[in-house]
Regions:
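Bacterial N-terminal signal peptides that target proteins for export
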Residues: 1-8
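Repetitive helical segments and hydrophobic/amphipathic motifs
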Residues: 11-13
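C-terminal motif of bacterial Sec signal peptides marking the signal peptidase cleavage site
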Residues: 15-18
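Bacterial signal peptide processing site
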Residues: 20-23
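Short, low-complexity N-terminal intrinsically disordered segments enriched in polar/charged residues
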Residues: 26-44
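Heme-based O2/NO sensor domains and their adjacent alpha-helical segments
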Residues: 30-36, 49-127, 133, 139-140, ...
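Short terminal or interdomain "cap/linker" segment that borders an active site or interface and mediates
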Residues: 144-154
Length: 154
């Protein structure tokens, strides 16, 4: 199965609140500059890339609840698409060029429990990089809109 991108993104979409944090520093949770975009407050593309790599390779790939969805997935491509998707959702300069979520996840029989496991993994990565609560909630809120296109099984 190709669980490409987002069941993430969930996460991505789900927002994963994802991405965020600066790979090297604590984003603190407040974000300080009220005029800064979520992309800026997350630490821009390098920080998003670090979070996505940790999320996919250290969390999802080792999560017995959902790792089977990714067995035949091109991981570098998945990570690149997730970075672009999160970057775009966070009002950064990236453009997501992957499939829409409904098409990407068609026939995968993804249940709420699978989606929730993915979100838990994303949250763990965001916490690992000390992404602030405000940024996590904002990102996850934006990504959560994809839930119904991803979860199709009961």
């Amino acid at each position: 199965m190709q669980f490409r991108m987002t069941l993430i993104s969930v996460l991505a979409v789900a927002v994963m609140a994802a991405c965020g944090g600066k790979a090297k520093t604590d984003t603190g949770g407040g974000g300080g500059d009220s005029g800064a975009t979520l992309y800026d407050r997350l630490g821009k593309k390098d920080a998003i890339t670090a979070v996505v790599k940790d999320f996919v390779e250290e969390r999802v790939a080792k999560d017995d609840r959902i790792k089977s969805f990714f067995l035949n997935t091109d991981i570098p491509n998945l990570e690149a698409k997730l970075v672009d998707q999160i970057c775009q959702v966070a009002k950064g300069p990236c453009t997501y060029t992957g499939k829409d979520m409904k098409t990407a996840h068609a026939g995968m029989n993804i249940k709420d429990a699978d989606f929730n496991a993915l979100v838990e993994d994303l949250k763990a990565s965001l916490d690992h990089f000390k992404v602030g609560d405000k940024e996590q909630k904002e990102l996850i809120g934006a990504l959560a809109t994809m839930h119904d296109d991803i979860v199709t099984a009961k």
